[in-house]
Amino acid sequence: MLDIQLLRKDLDGVAKRLADRGYTLDVAAFTALEAERRDTQTRTEEMQARRNSLSKQIGALKGKGEDTSAVMAEVSGIGDEMKASAARLDEIQKRLSDLLLGVPNLPHESVPLGKDETENVEVRRWGTPRQFEFEVKDHVDVGAPLGLDFETGAKLSGARFTMLRGQIARLHRALAQFMIDTHTQHHGYTEIYTPYIVNPEILYGTGQLPKFADDMFRVEKGGDENTVTQYLISTSEISLTNTVRDSILEADALPIKLTAHSPCFRSEAGSYGRDTRGLIRQHQFDKVEMVQIVAPETSYDALEQMVGHAETILQKLELPYRVITLCTGDMGFSAAKTYDLEVWVPAQNTYREISSCSNTESFQARRMQARYRNAQGKPELVHTLNGSGLAVGRTLVAVLENFQNADGSVTVPVALRPYLGGLERLELPAA
């Protein structure tokens, strides 16, 4: 959530920066609500002052032994008016809050201007795409004989669900374990096992609600009269980041670096017809997430560090990739700046997103009321960052395609072999 004081001080400037990312701020609605708030607040304060003055008069009259009934009646009437005015002020504040909950973050000054993904800026590349001496297969054709089972997944749960069997299941598990071990043993993260179901207010904290309710899977428990609505997490960023909600941390507790391997559940409401074949876009997929909670002055250094941590995974797996800075028009709702890592997918002859690393600055922290004591000992909002380290299913796609062999086998990347008992190749089952 944006700082409402910023809108009050520079509404036109905020509207311009939001327009850069393709969002039109309802300036008229905000201005009208602000005027109503100021008027109601002024009236409430005037009534408070009048009541205080009358209370002093009552004391003086009693001291003189004079009748106070008329003044006390006026005080009582003012009290009733103040209650109504306070209720009105609360209602206006809620409408302002609801308006702000739908407003995205402001882009950092270093973010390139652009309307959509075509105007993202490439930062660097690593690795050289392999030149194959045979016709390249996509991961579906490579993986199906090795245990990638789309038919059973669809039979059990419908489209965009997949079952992994045998060698493929082991490889998938090895990838996640390798990622977690790298982040905890070399990058300083603490591993967390997180709930996969959260309460609605948790999603407001990280920005999935109210705007992206259609992208979430909702679950209900209890009978008709006592139904409780909760949500399946679309990323463990949600639960990891909210561990500091409603907290005031000591400065020496920062930075906090957390990582988790979890399934993620997304309805993909806006992606009909996109990536319908294979593992690229699923309703359920695994991801290793990185989250950092830091002091504001260190957050952009932390962002670069986090990108480096995701890059390390790709480099150890020997997967070619590139780093992209997202332009203003392509960033996620909560982000002030985002880097995407895109891995080379041979069958598509292109790079595809495998990690997204974002600094949300104080946007999520303000919604969560996550603070720390600064050098002056005063509570100040932390900055929160999140990044994929990596999406496990998409990494599996990249391994199957980049390490495929002409005979249908797949060479296991060297970094993964200790997690597979030294296995060097996934072999086709004997006929």
From Swiss-Prot:
EC supergroup of this enzyme: ligase
Pathway note: Aminoacyl-tRNA biosynthesis; selenocysteinyl-tRNA(Sec) biosynthesis; L-seryl-tRNA(Sec) from L-serine and tRNA(Sec): step 1/1
Localization of this protein: Cytoplasm
EC number(s) per entry: 6.1.1.11
Catalytic activity: tRNA(Ser) + L-serine + ATP = L-seryl-tRNA(Ser) + AMP + diphosphate + H(+); tRNA(Sec) + L-serine + ATP = L-seryl-tRNA(Sec) + AMP + diphosphate + H(+)
Keyword flag Glycoprotein: no
GO terms, molecular function: ATP binding; serine-tRNA ligase activity
UniProt keyword terms in alphabetical order: Aminoacyl-tRNA synthetase, ATP-binding, Cytoplasm, Ligase, Nucleotide-binding, Protein biosynthesis
PROSITE patterns from the UniProt entry: AA_TRNA_LIGASE_II
Keyword Protein biosynthesis: yes
Any single Gene Ontology cellular-component annotation: cytoplasm
Main location: cytoplasm
InterPro entries: aa-tRNA-synt_IIb (IPR002314), aa-tRNA-synth_II (IPR006195), aa-tRNA-synth_II/BPL/LPL (IPR045864), Ser-tRNA-ligase_type_1 (IPR002317), Ser-tRNA-synth_1_N (IPR015866), SerRS_1_N_sf (IPR042103), SerRS_core (IPR033729), tRNA-bd_arm (IPR010978)
Functional summary from the UniProt entry: Catalyzes the attachment of serine to tRNA(Ser). Is also able to aminoacylate tRNA(Sec) with serine, to form the misacylated tRNA L-seryl-tRNA(Sec), which will be further converted into selenocysteinyl-tRNA(Sec).
Protein name: Serine--tRNA ligase
The organism's taxonomic lineage, starting at the top: Bacteria, Pseudomonadati, Pseudomonadota, Betaproteobacteria, Burkholderiales
